[in-house]
From Swiss-Prot:
Species per Swiss-Prot/TrEMBL record: Arabidopsis thaliana
Protein name: Putative defensin-like protein 52
Protein family: Belongs to the DEFL family.
Lineage: Eukaryota, Viridiplantae, Streptophyta, Embryophyta, Tracheophyta
Subcellular location: Secreted
Keyword set, alphabetical order: Antimicrobial, Disulfide bond, Fungicide, Plant defense, Secreted, Signal
Cystine bridges: C31-C55, C41-C64
Amino acid sequence: MTFFLVIILAISSSNYNVLAVSGPPKCIALCRPGYYERFECFHDCITEGYDDGSCVPGPTTAKCGIITKTTNKICYSFAFE
């Protein structure tokens, strides 16, 4: 009986982080060269709890993207120029 109670206590004290996500997290603002660039992406993504941030311009869009090392969440924001 004591062994059973120890097992129940060990299981109930475990720390599980469960997150239900309906889609990828949204960045705070649109990433656009000359307006919202690397510094702003880093600031907003890190403020939201992500590990890193980047701003990658493209021919018709720019993306603010980050991936956390622990949960592999991706945060993208696209801006049409």
